Amino acid sequence: MILAYIQTSIMSRRCMGEEVLLVENIQIDDTSPPGGLVSIWTLNRPNKLNSLNSESHKALKEACEMAESNDLIRVIVIRGASPIPPLEGKRAKPASFAAGADISEFLGKNSDDVRDFFEDNAWERVWKLS
């Protein structure tokens, strides 16, 4: 089996000018059936250790919908973006898949809003992909 690069598509979900989830689809160049695509999803908030905010959750849900509607996708790999190199004299941030929830987003919100955020779980949709 040979993997051949065919396309890169970036989810349109942005947070403060950055794409929070990058989606890359790679063609499986295989002469035997079924062929198809490997979809690589990169959590792209390295300055926040790829922590998940509401925009990340929305992007993951959109990516799940895209994957469910594309019968060519055979495998999904989810990874975290590499850390940004530190400024001179600053300590480097550690590499991470995802640091968890970005709790800074909950400042000033009431407990009902926070509970709603966690009840509408994007990871549950990821686990249910078929």
Task: Indicate where each model-derived feature is located.
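Glycine- (often His-adjacent) and acidic-residue-rich active-site loop
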Residues: G80-W127
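Conserved CoA-thioester-binding segment of acyl-CoA-metabolizing enzymes
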Residues: I2-A92
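Short beta-strand/loop segments at the ligand-binding rim of alpha/beta enzyme cores
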Residues: S130
